[in-house]
């Protein structure tokens, strides 16, 4: 999957960016 949450984007290092 490439989605973390609504309005958030997956980071290349792991985790999410909102």
UniProtKB/Swiss-Prot annotation:
It comes from the Eukaryota. GO terms for molecular function: toxin activity. Disulfide bonds join 4-16, 8-18. Keywords: Amidation, Disulfide bond, Secreted, Toxin. GO terms for cellular component: extracellular region. Belongs to the poneritoxin-Ae1 family. This is U1-poneritoxin-Ae1d. It comes from Anochetus emarginatus.
